[in-house]
Design a protein with these regions (language model features):
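Conformationally flexible catalytic loops at phosphate/diphosphate-handling active centers
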Residues: 1-4, 8-27
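Single conserved hydrophobic/aromatic residue that forms the stacking wall/gate
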Residues: 2-3, 7, 187, 192-196
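Solvent-exposed alpha-helices and their adjacent loops that cap or buttress functional pockets
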Residues: 29-33, 81-83, 120-122, 181-184
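Redox- and metal-dependent alpha/beta enzyme cores, enriched for Fe-S-associated oxidoreductases
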Residues: 33-60, 73-78
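Short glycine/threonine-rich loop-to-helix capping motif typified by GTGT followed
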Residues: 42, 53, 73-84, 102-104, ...
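Peripheral docking tails and interdomain loops at the edges
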Residues: 88-183
Length: 196
C-alpha cells in the first residue's frame, strides 16, 4: 500500500510538472466551516461548485468535496480535506450496485469516517447519506444539487436516495425544487418538463 502511495504521489507531481495543474486526491470547495457537504467525482463537480457559489452568497454553510483520485483510496487525504465542522454529508455515486449494501464511494467514505471516529481522529461522526445520480444518462442539474442540500437539512433525511431520476418502484427519488438561481446563471437553466 505504501508503494502505491509513492507511485500515486510521483504520478501526480509529474502531471503537475507537465500541465501546470496541481491536483490532490481530494479537494474541498466551499465554506471553510461548512455544515453540509456533498462528496462526489466526475463531471457533476462543476454543477455542484456553481450551486455552492450561489448558496454561499445566501449565507449557507455548504461545500463540495471533489474526488480527484479514487483508487487507491486515501482515507487520510479525505479526512484532511473534509472540514471538521461538517454535520451532514451526502455521498453521490453514479452507479447502482445490485446486491451490495451500498454504492462504492459511499462505503469508502463511511468506512474512513467511522474508523477515524473509532480511532479518536474525529470527535464527531457526521450523518452520512448516499445517493445515486446520472444513471441512464439522466441530467444532473442545479435543481438536483439544491435537492441534495435540502435533504441534508432535513430532520430525518433518507439514508439512500436517487436524484434527477424518477423512481416509482422504490420511491427513493428526491423532489426537485423550482429553479431559485439568479438570472445570471442562464447557462444553468432548468428543464421545463419533469424528470422521467
Amino acid at each position: 500500500r505504501q508503494r502505491q502511495m509513492c507511485i500515486r504521489d510521483r504520478a501526480m507531481n509529474d502531471f503537475s510538472a507537465a500541465t501546470g495543474r496541481q491536483y490532490q486526491p481530494f479537494e474541498y470547495y466551499g465554506h471553510p466551516q461548512a455544515e453540509r457537504v456533498i462528496i462526489l467525482m466526475g463531471s457533476a463537480i462543476g454543477t455542484c461548485e456553481e450551486v455552492v457559489d450561489e448558496l454561499l452568497t445566501r449565507g449557507e454553510k455548504v461545500g463540495v468535496l471533489k474526488v480527484r483520485l479514487y483508487r487507491p483510496f486515501s482515507a487520510k487525504h479525505l479526512l484532511q480535506a473534509l472540514p471538521g465542522s461538517v454535520r451532514s454529508v451526502a455521498v453521490l455515486d453514479r452507479t447502482k450496485e445490485p446486491g451490495a449494501q451500498a454504492e462504492p464511494l459511499y462505503l469508502d467514505v463511511m468506512t474512513a469516517l467511522a474508523e477515524a471516529f473509532n480511532n479518536g481522529e474525529r470527535e464527531t461522526l457526521p450523518r452520512v447519506i448516499g445517493g445515486r445520480y446520472g444513471l441512464s444518462s439522466k441530467e444532473f442539474g442545479p435543481d438536483c444539487v439544491l435537492a441534495v442540500f435540502a435533504e441534508l437539512n432535513a430532520a430525518k433525511p433518507k439514508a439512500r436516495f436517487t436524484v434527477g431520476i424518477y423512481d416509482d418502484v422504490t420511491n427513493l427519488s428526491l423532489p426537485l425544487p423550482e429553479n431559485t438561481l439568479p438570472v445570471s446563471y442562464t447557462h444553468l437553466t432548468l428543464p421545463t418538463t419533469p424528470y422521467v
